[in-house]
Amino acid sequence: MKLTLLRHGETEGSRRDLYYGAADIPVLPEALEALRHKALTGIYPTAGHYCVSGLQRTIQTLHAIYGDVGYTVLPGLREMDFGDFEMRAYAGDLEHDPQFIAWCEDVEHNICPHGESAAQVLARSVAAIEPVLRRGEDTVCVIHGGVTSGLMIHWFGGILYDYSPAPGTGYQVIFDGEKPLNYTNIG
């Protein structure tokens, strides 16, 4: 089975280096157009099944790349809820926030105030992707950078920065049953 994980297209949040996970912000119009053109090159794998997290940026990206295909919404693949840090930038804002500084001491385990921890996001992401793997059908999931990174670390080891896909890029993972064998970069 081939499982393709693609990060949604560029948003105002990614352009401004904001912490945005739960915020349902759109892909920039020019980024959608760039994805449409990139898709014409054939760089994106196709599949028999498509999934999104349900946030508009994932649905917009799916349609920009694959057109009007049917899809399944898997809310468990939504990005981390940064709680009180949502839609805020580090520079000039969060760098002075004592709660943010405390969270940064262990971002993998500390919970964002009124949000989630990376461990909580990984647990729900793994639970959400397990039925897809059990089905065994080639699948494309248009999701989020943090979720993609977490799943890749879970399957292949490493650290967050080993698997931080840029908008519109990702990985194709080859599975034998539910066992990940290897991966290639997409985009």
Label for each model-derived stretch:
Residues 64, 150-154:
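Active-site signature of alpha/beta-hydrolase-fold catalytic machinery across serine-
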Residues 24, 76-79, 167-170:
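Short, acidic/turn-prone active-site loops that include or flank metal/cofactor-
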Residues 11, 147-148:
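Short active-site segment of divalent metal-dependent hydrolases/proteases
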Residues 3, 48, 136-146:
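Generic beta-sheet signal
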Residues 2-69:
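Active-site-proximal alpha-helix that buttresses catalytic centers in soluble enzyme cores
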Residues 52-53, 123, 142-143:
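Short beta-strand scaffold positions
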Residues 158-184:
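Domain-level recognition of soluble alpha/beta enzyme cores
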